[in-house]
């Protein structure tokens, strides 16, 4: 499933690349290319962790139909569109949230999907904050990985295949 998910993402990125080129040629915005190799390496590590967190979260949500088959598409839509897009920093930077809410959101796995890797790439998160962010995202990676295996094993026990 992971390779299927990755191939879908690569296809989406290829289409987005052409859209990006067209918009760039029309608007000519300034582009920022990170020069610091350590920041680039930290960014790549944060991207790999983000990909795995995203996969684990969607795998867990996609397992909901084991217990409630009628919720297959709805639960997936709710999590991907509402929760992930909203809380990951894809729609707006998490910095604009009030301090208390921002701290709560930063303790969840969602910001480590988009907001954190982007801030690392821009060089806004370095040093101790970078290590803290990578540690928190790694902890979420382990928690979600264990949860995924648990949900999958429990789901297979209750699975009932019916049909012709």
Give names to the regions the model predicted.
Residues 1-9:
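Helix-loop-helix units of permease transmembrane domains in multi-pass membrane transporters
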Residues 8, 12, 70, 97, ...:
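Membrane-interface junctions
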Residues 48-63, 83-95, 146-155:
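Transmembrane alpha-helical segments that form the membrane-embedded catalytic/substrate-channel core
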């Amino acid at each position: 499933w992971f390779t299927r998910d990755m191939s879908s993402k690569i296809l989406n990125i290829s289409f987005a690349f052409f859209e990006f080129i067209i918009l760039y040629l029309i608007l000519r915005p300034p582009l920022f290319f990170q020069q610091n190799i350590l920041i680039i390496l930290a960014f790549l590590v944060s991207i790999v962790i983000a990909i795995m967190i995203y996969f684990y979260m969607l795998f867990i949500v996609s397992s909901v139909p084991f217990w409630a088959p009628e919720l297959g598409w709805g639960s997936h839509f709710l999590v991907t569109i509402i929760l992930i897009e909203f809380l990951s920093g894809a729609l707006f930077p998490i910095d604009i949230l009030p301090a208390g809410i921002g701290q709560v959101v930063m303790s969840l796995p969602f910001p480590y999907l988009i907001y954190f890797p982007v801030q690392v790439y821009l060089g806004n998160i370095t040093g101790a904050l970078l290590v803290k962010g990578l540690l928190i995202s790694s902890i979420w990676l382990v928690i979600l990985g264990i949860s995924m295996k648990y949900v999958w094993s429990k789901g297979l026990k209750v699975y009932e295949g019916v049909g012709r």
